[in-house]
Curated annotation (Swiss-Prot):
One GO cellular component term noted in the UniProt record for this chain: extracellular region
Gene: eno
Keyword terms, alphabetized: Cytoplasm, Glycolysis, Lyase, Magnesium, Metal-binding, Secreted
E.C. designation(s): 4.2.1.11
Binding residues annotated for Mg(2+), in chain numbering: 246, 287, 314
Cofactor: how and how many bound: Binds a second Mg(2+) ion via substrate during catalysis.
Name of this protein: Enolase
Localization: Cytoplasm; Secreted; Cell surface
UniProt record similarity statement: Belongs to the enolase family.
Active-site positions on this chain: 209, 339
Chain positions recorded as (2R)-2-phosphoglycerate binding sites: 167, 339, 368-369, 390
Amino acid sequence: MKETIDFLIDTIEARQVLDSRGNPTVEAEVFLECGAIGRAIVPSGASTGAHEAHELRDGGTKYMGKGVLDAVNKIHETISPALCGLSALDQTIIDKLMIEIDGTPNKSNLGANSILAVSLANARAASKALDMPLYRYLGDPLSNLLPVPLMNVINGGAHAPNGLDCQEFMLVPHGVKTFSEALRMGTEIFHSLKSLLDKKGLSTAVGDEGGFAPELSSCEAAGDLLLEAIQKAGFIPGKQVSLALDVASTEFYRDGFYKYEGTNLTSSQMISYLSNLVSNYPIVSIEDGLGEDDWEGWAALNKEIGHKVQLVGDDLFVTNTERLRKGILEKSANSILIKVNQIGTLTETLEAMDLAKSAGFTSVISHRSGETEDTTIADLSVATRAGQIKTGSLSRSERIAKYNRLLRIEEELGNQARFAGDLGLGPKNI
């Protein structure tokens, strides 16, 4: 039996490492008195919302200004001295103390990247000290639900240098009984899609998240390709495998218009366009269908199609409880995307998920386009019984690492493991 002193933080180390785009990011290690060590690496986004917590970068010439040595120094010089001697089991106290020391609304003093690295590393250290898997430590004995994967197999927008304005076209394999079956289904469709692209003379180069980045002219062209790939792989669109979109509308919202596929659309016209897509394709989820501050448009979109599909706020909510409360009050959406680095601590992430659940919203755990080998979000999805996870395509090892972690968790849970399947999707199945 470990004594209380065994869980005390002895020291915290940090370093600059690289993410999947070759850009610097922060890695932190929390060392406990008992010898347990927790390590975490933070991700970084390409299409970042204006309301996200602040990511500290060095500027200057090294790494084109994207170095994070300042953030590393903040951990060594400010965060570590403040946290040493505290119990790693007191996650909320640790996170709130870092927020207090930072003293800014968006963590621009210490940097969300430095704070989050320590927050996640601390949770890992605590779980190791207790000899528990992270999903069990963060969750409870009933944390046995494996999420439906939303697999980004065609990349566009800020994630790929092609002509697609829509950022992500995702496969949603839900009509099976296990996560491993869903992963197999998605993988077979991914390879089917590659074969189709080859035959059509289209590029099979991949984007930031491992999806293909062919030169396509429209969202509909991508949707048609996915339906063809699903059927070619031997599966039934809409029954076994559905589609999801991340429109990332903020990226092309300018001067009151959505500059989409060569035309200027009003909010009302964009809503009509999305409604038509839902009518013509087996789409179960649309993320960021409108811009991050188009609150009136979001409410209209939710009224129009929120009873049919999951409407996910990413840039709209940025994993922030204040913006989520506004969205709940105004009935702006029915789901929230959860990105730990948007808010900057594990505690605030869990608070956002609790608030979403209390309002009947679904939560989708998500990676970022600049990822690492860190697999925390896989454990988080099971710990919180989120029911859905976005962690990229079926290529690039920083994406596969999360899928492989979920396979191990499913195996570890044995006959207690459940797969979210159809029940993991919203809004009708909330």
